[in-house]
């Protein structure tokens, strides 16, 4: 029989290191956060072999007193909290006193430090958690921590390390986040003698963004701010034309601490509405300042998860801050820049094709423009005026179905089929990207456009006061029709339609338990599920606004929505239907329209709340300014913008 014993402190530290120190990036994070808490204004991070051989952090903070240096390597020794009450008003990044002893237990650690006014500094060397020497030493005010041979005594950890490039990438990401969290501090990251990242430490967040993401990206970010009695929000988000393929470029900070929060990420996307393309994400650097009593940071070993009181109010503030800032912007993409991004420039000399002149003179006789046939016009007019039909998709019951014996229909989750659409739709699993986003669109100014031509039956050309505009006719009418349908889908009839064949829905045990608790929320929107066996629910009637062919996917989606967000909305669910209808009933590509219809479409577009994007986030129009034209024909040269000029933006 084994007996209970108290583990030696060194072994306990190694176990704790398993949670706190996962990889070299964890060492960098913990040591740099200590440097920030020490009041540093300059922090230099030097690494060798992606941190596995060496991590050295040098700061100019307060330092550690000589008689406290050894104490700093003991578990739960800290200067940041004194009693239980301090745990609920944490303003520092660290507070547990675990990082330094955990790092020392799995490495060779050398610490050199000095405080202001001391006659000398202190040098400490520890190997595997055991202190080998503590001696006086010469040192500037501040602290230098050198961590060598990481995981030398835990070879199993080394076995699972990724490539040096992958580990270096994690370190760069950590330093970048810290640089964005604290623009008042100068950060420098040096890997194997090469500087990877540097921030100026001027306190200007836009300059920190420029140092990390580049000057071009910094110029395309707009400032946001909002506040109430509990929260103060500030930061920058990118214009919709500057996006990335994942959420990694969204950085959220609470009281200077980088956090990960799904609901706040969703609030950011909600603020953009449908101005973002599906599957694209903005760059965002958002600082949230709150009373420490409203945030619990002591819920995760890495402190990246934070529980926030009044989270819904905070989400609303974030969304409103972004929506209000975007409302003040002209969101028509610059065509010349888009061309530069999408065109593959061939540097080889291209032989010019000689085109014979049709006439001997430069001018030709004016001819009447070709007109579409009566059939084409009729087809187009049907498409233009077809709105409003079949907004409610009721299943028609046939005599054969009425005479069939009753039975149970076991519902299955089936993938949606969007093969017949022009482009991919939002799937129901990501419905929170749909109506919540689309509902927040604000009216904004739209240029006066004078239509003058069409190309390939797809693009309309118009002239404005400040240049040439090219409009995608399908995307334009899709936006117009979507906004017509948007109000209609919210007017929901709560009447019920009996099902001749009830549906059985089955869920995992944990989901079934939570659904039972939240069933009243489903009933509020007309969905009545009754328990039917273990982890199963039966649906005997459906709300009349839900078409019968939508029942399986629709009920599962609404339940998923309820489990994920603790709320359910008919409008969110039906947003997909509005998007599909607007897509199917809009002018298709390669379809010529007459001048009157084109002008009418441009007028309708100008009346939209958001005339810049279709419901999927694709741009409706692009803009060539007069300056763009002059650049294309080399009439003017582009000026270079320096980092110093960022203050003008």
UniProtKB/Swiss-Prot annotation:
It holds the Pfam family MutL_C. HAMAP family: DNA_mis_repair. Keywords: DNA damage, DNA repair. The lineage of its organism: Bacteria, Bacillati, Bacillota, Bacilli, Lactobacillales. GO terms for biological process: mismatch repair. This is DNA mismatch repair protein HexB. It comes from Streptococcus pneumoniae serotype 4 (strain ATCC BAA-334 / TIGR4). SUPFAM superfamilies: ATPase domain of HSP90 chaperone/DNA topoisomerase II/histidine kinase, DNA mismatch repair protein MutL, Ribosomal protein S5 domain 2-like. Belongs to the DNA mismatch repair MutL/HexB family. The gene is hexB. This protein is involved in the repair of mismatches in DNA. The hex system is nick-directed. GO terms for cellular component: mismatch repair complex. One of its GO terms (molecular function) is ATP binding. CDD domains: HATPase_MutL-MLH-PMS-like (cd16926), MutL_Trans (cd00782). InterPro entries: DNA_mismatch_repair_CS, DNA_mismatch_repair_MutL, DNA_mismatch_S5_2-like, HATPase_C_sf, MutL/Mlh/PMS, MutL/Mlh/Pms-like, MutL_C, MutL_C_dimsub.
